[in-house]
From Swiss-Prot:
It comes from Bacillus thuringiensis (strain Al Hakam). This is Probable nicotinate-nucleotide adenylyltransferase. GO terms for molecular function: ATP binding; nicotinate-nucleotide adenylyltransferase activity. Pathway: Cofactor biosynthesis; NAD(+) biosynthesis; deamido-NAD(+) from nicotinate D-ribonucleotide: step 1/1. Belongs to the NadD family. Keywords: ATP-binding, NAD, Nucleotide-binding, Nucleotidyltransferase, Pyridine nucleotide biosynthesis, Transferase. HAMAP family: NaMN_adenylyltr. One of its GO terms (biological process) is NAD biosynthetic process. Catalyzes the reversible adenylation of nicotinate mononucleotide (NaMN) to nicotinic acid adenine dinucleotide (NaAD). CDD domains: NMNAT. The keyword Phosphoprotein does not apply.
Amino acid sequence: MRKIGIIGGTFDPPHYGHLLIANEVYHALNLEEVWFLPNQIPPHKQGRNITSVESRLQMLELATEAEEHFSICLEELSRKGPSYTYDTMLQLTKKYPDVQFHFIIGGDMVEYLPKWYNIEALLDLVTFVGVARPGYTLHTSYPITTVEIPEFAVSSSLLRERYKEKKTCKYLLPEKVQVYIERNGLYES
């Protein structure tokens, strides 16, 4: 059975924290590859102004293109409405019955697991992999595999704020992503 990691998110913008997490879990669990799963509309972020799907996808392609064991899964972008992990993983497990999926989440989402849509059924579809995030714990009553990663306190919201304040973001996200953001005037206001 193939072992594939999935890291979901809005990737608004994608940054070195996302890449670090994906790479550390890839090596720690001896995965075949890691799929980045951009959300259409995450249920916990409904109502927030999110950058267009086209721009987020382009930035994610730029961020992941250098790693042959990273790819992008468009499953959630093909659906309208909120992106529920259960619905996505139900589709993916039917589409790829020979794959054992390892769904990678940060400490913030580990704490949020009790509120996930259809969590009990989702546990039958994936193995959750929790990685530490500053300010959050990995304690939960749900079964998760934990992977230690170097602490890197960067987030997409921090980067959007830094761009808005016209602060440097060098060394926080890939240079090609920075160039795309600047050329397209993203996060300026």
